[in-house]
Amino acid sequence: MKKIGIIGGTFDPPHYGHLLIANEVYHTLELDEVWFLPNQIPPHKRNRNVTSAEDRRKMLELAIEKEGYFSLCLEELEREGPSYTYDTMLQLTKKHPDTTFYFIIGGDMVEYLPKWYNIEKLLELVTFVGVARPGYTLQTPYKILTIEIPEFAVSSSLLRERYKNKKTCKYLLPEQVQSYIERNGLYES
């Protein structure tokens, strides 16, 4: 059986925090790969303007290009409508029956698990891996694996705000992602 970690998100933009989480879980659980799963329309962020799927895909490709065990999974970007993890994982488990999936989530999402669409059935498809995040406990009524990682308190919303206010983002996200953002004028207003 292959062991694949999945880290889902908007990745608007992807940053070193995402890469750190993926790398730590990869090594701790001795995974074969980690797939980055950018979502089309996250159900919990429907009212927020999200950078285009194409720009987010390109930034994510740039962010993970140097790591052989990181891959891009476009399952949700290629599907219209809201991105429900249950629907995605149902498709992926059918396509990859020889794989055990570990779905990686931050502490903020661990607390939100009871509200996830079809959570009981989703728990039959994946093992959730909760990663500690500042300000959140890993409390949930569900059985999950928990992993402590070095704290890196950066978020995509912080980066968007810094770009909007013309502050430096150096050392917070990969240089090639930073160049892409600047070249394409993302997050300027």
Curated annotation (Swiss-Prot):
> What are the GO BP annotations of this UniProt entry?
NAD biosynthetic process
Q: What is its EC number?
A: 2.7.7.18
- List the Pfam families: CTP_transf_like
Record keywords:
ATP-binding, NAD, Nucleotide-binding, Nucleotidyltransferase, Pyridine nucleotide biosynthesis, Transferase
Question: Which reactions is this enzyme annotated as catalysing?
Answer: nicotinate beta-D-ribonucleotide + ATP + H(+) = deamido-NAD(+) + diphosphate
Record's InterPro entries?
Cyt_trans-like, NadD/NMNAT, Rossmann-like_a/b/a_fold
Pathway it works in: Cofactor biosynthesis; NAD(+) biosynthesis; deamido-NAD(+) from nicotinate D-ribonucleotide: step 1/1
Q: What GO molecular function annotation could you give as one example from this UniProt entry?
A: ATP binding
What job does the chain carry out? Catalyzes the reversible adenylation of nicotinate mononucleotide (NaMN) to nicotinic acid adenine dinucleotide (NaAD).
Q: HAMAP family annotated for this entry?
A: NaMN_adenylyltr
Report the family membership: Belongs to the NadD family.
What is the name of this protein? Probable nicotinate-nucleotide adenylyltransferase
- Please name the gene that encodes this protein: nadD
